[in-house]
């Protein structure tokens, strides 16, 4: 589903308190190098997903193994060792089903096979088996709101009003000759109704014309889609990321949406989607889906694409206090913004702890639909330091964490400068107000060789970003101070620390609007302090651990950027350099 969000020289006077090993760390970053981490959290009986680091793979752009310029399944298998060494628990693979590729795989013509450009079912089975050997689980992208108009179901449905598949889609008469049934709009522009001359009726499509919506009020549709999920569960997938899950049902009375005023990128009026999005009946479907996947062993997972306006609106997607729907709705409020605002982060992280009946958020800063966080949060000067702050926030918060390929090396958004170069249909129809999503989907930058090591074909499906000779996995792997090694250290610390795995969050001094400081404290007493200076100025803050009811008198630096960083008495004032990130244990 497409929703674009636009919307250390450190404590120098106390340096002598640092252990000598920390003082000798490379300048720019502290902490031991990122080794391959065990994927089993020590002494934890929680389901695997509760503290997971999930890595989104956009398969067209990850790794090409057959020289056609498009990434594929065997390319993913080739890079599993990299993902293991990074420390991820699971990979979510964007759609790889047979598809006409109008929306690059989100228009599916066969739910139980693999698109030939990505490989075969045998390639997929090999990927799952090889990932399992590395303690990496595989999640599929389940696109359940709609199919391709080339799917056999829709071809049958469109053929006749009396066809048995007719009611598998949403068909209606126009409200007048030549007029659609109501004012509903497609997310990608213009009317959400398409006239079919074969039967003289309109079909509903929330997305592209070529993506007709399934009629989830028909029990046969639910049965067929649940069977599709079983097909992949039986092949060993660990669960699903559910695309556009808030849009499964529409108002059966077809009432017009309220008009808000103004126009969107396509020139259509802005509507309040109260009749096409987030209808209560969606939750009944998800509850039945959860009951079905719970019959499988191994803590199978449902992740939901859940864009909401307020944190409390995520709670129903867990099933409220019952926790019988999604295990991990995506919390996009924290990360899919562009304001590096400590007060805003403090409020949203606090809400996630108090308003979700104990539900575990899945924090998201990057995905295949959003301008990369490097560009959204960066100021053009301090982007590298800000990227470390974002990583620390993502990986030390009380959450499951979602990474998007390339985020860990600082890939940038490479938006086309000419409409002639755009591949994404939303960029073609919305140009220049909306330039599409090509910029965040450019090929993964593996090394400094031609095409960044992504493909041996000089004509890749999207151009490789020009900075690949210096921004790539190979270069950053060899640099202890790189963003990639910062991510590895954070993930390893997250896995080894009971406080970061299981601890509650205690927000500390809020008097400085530029600094976010919080403690994670585990039931057994371990406490980890996180302090992030979100400004270009040096900031001095009181830590205030005792005032927050936390015990401990000494701090020991675990990770810091920039370095060196000192330990300090827990209630002293601390000076943070511009855009500093500091993680410390409280003893």
Predicted feature residues:
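Bacterial N-terminal signal peptides
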Residues: 7-17
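Sec/Tat signal peptide C-region and signal peptidase I cleavage site
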Residues: 20-21
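Acidic/aromatic-lined carbohydrate-recognition and catalytic surfaces
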Residues: 25-230, 234, 247-309, 444
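Beta-strand-rich binding/interaction modules
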Residues: 538-561
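C-terminal beta-strand-rich structural cap/linker in extracellular carbohydrate-active enzymes
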Residues: 567-587
């Amino acid at each position: 589903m497409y929703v674009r969000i636009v919307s250390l020289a450190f404590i120098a006077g106390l340096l002598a308190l640092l252990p000598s090993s920390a003082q000798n760390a490379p300048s720019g970053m502290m902490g031991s190098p990122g080794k391959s981490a065990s994927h089993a959290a020590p002494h934890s009986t929680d389901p695997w997903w509760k503290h997971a680091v999930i890595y989104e793979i956009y398969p067209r752009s990850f790794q090409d193994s057959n020289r056609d310029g498009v990434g594929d399944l065997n390319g993913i298998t080739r890079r599993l060792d990299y993902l293991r060494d990074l420390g991820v628990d699971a990979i979510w693979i964007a759609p790889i089903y047979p598809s006409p590729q109008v929306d690059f795989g989100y228009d599916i013509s066969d739910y139980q096979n693999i698109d030939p450009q990505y490989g075969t079912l045998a390639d997929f089975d090999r990927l799952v088996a090889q990932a399992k050997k590395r303690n990496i689980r595989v999640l599929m992208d389940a696109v359940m709101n709609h199919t391709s108009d080339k799917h056999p179901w829709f071809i049958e449905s469109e053929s006749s009003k009396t066809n048995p598949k007719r009611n598998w889609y949403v068909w209606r008469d126009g409200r007048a000759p030549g007029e659609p049934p109501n004012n509903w709009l497609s997310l990608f522009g213009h009317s959400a109704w398409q006239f079919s001359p074969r039967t003289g009726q309109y079909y509903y499509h929330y997305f592209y014309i070529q993506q007709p919506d399934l009629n989830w009020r028909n029990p046969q549709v639910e049965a067929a889609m649940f069977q599709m999920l079983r097909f992949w569960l039986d092949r060993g997938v660990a669960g699903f990321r559910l695309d556009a899950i808030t849009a499964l049902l529409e108002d059966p009375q077809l009432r017009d949406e309220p008009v808000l005023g103004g126009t969107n990128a396509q020139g259509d009026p802005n509507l309040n989607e109260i009749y096409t999005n987030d209808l209560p009946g969606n939750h009944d479907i998800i509850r039945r889906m959860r009951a079905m996947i719970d019959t499988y062993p191994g803590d199978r997972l449902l992740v939901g694409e859940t864009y909401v306006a307020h944190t409390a609106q995520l709670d129903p997607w867990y099933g409220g206090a019952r926790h019988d729907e999604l295990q991990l709705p995506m919390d996009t409020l924290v990360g899919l913004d562009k304001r590096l605002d400590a007060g805003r982060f403090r409020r949203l992280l606090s809400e996630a702890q108090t308003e979700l009946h104990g539900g575990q958020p899945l924090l998201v800063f990057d995905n295949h639909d959003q301008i990369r966080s490097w560009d959204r949060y960066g100021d053009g000067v301090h982007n590298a330091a800000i990227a470390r702050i974002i990583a620390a926030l993502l990986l030390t918060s009380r959450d499951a964490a979602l990474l998007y390929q390339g985020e860990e090396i600082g890939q940038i958004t490479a938006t086309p400068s000419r409409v002639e170069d755009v591949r994404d249909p939303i960029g073609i129809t919305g140009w220049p107000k909306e330039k599409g999503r090509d910029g965040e989907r450019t090929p993964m930058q593996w090394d400094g060789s031609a095409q960044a090591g992504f493909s041996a074909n000089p004509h890749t499906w999207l151009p490789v970003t020009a900075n690949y000779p210096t921004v790539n996995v190979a270069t950053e792997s060899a640099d202890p101070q790189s963003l990639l090694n910062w991510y590895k250290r954070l993930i390893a610390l997250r896995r080894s620390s009971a406080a970061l795995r299981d601890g509650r969050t205690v927000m500390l001094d809020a008097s400085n609007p530029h600094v976010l400081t919080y403690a994670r404290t585990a039931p057994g007493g371990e406490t980890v302090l996180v302090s992030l200076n979100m400004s270009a100025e040096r900031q001095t803050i009181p830590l205030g651990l005792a005032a927050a009811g936390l015990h401990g008198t000494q701090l020991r630096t675990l990770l810091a950027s920039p370095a060196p960083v000192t330990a300090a008495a827990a209630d002293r004032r601390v000076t943070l350099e511009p855009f500093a990130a500091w993680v410390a244990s409280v003893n």
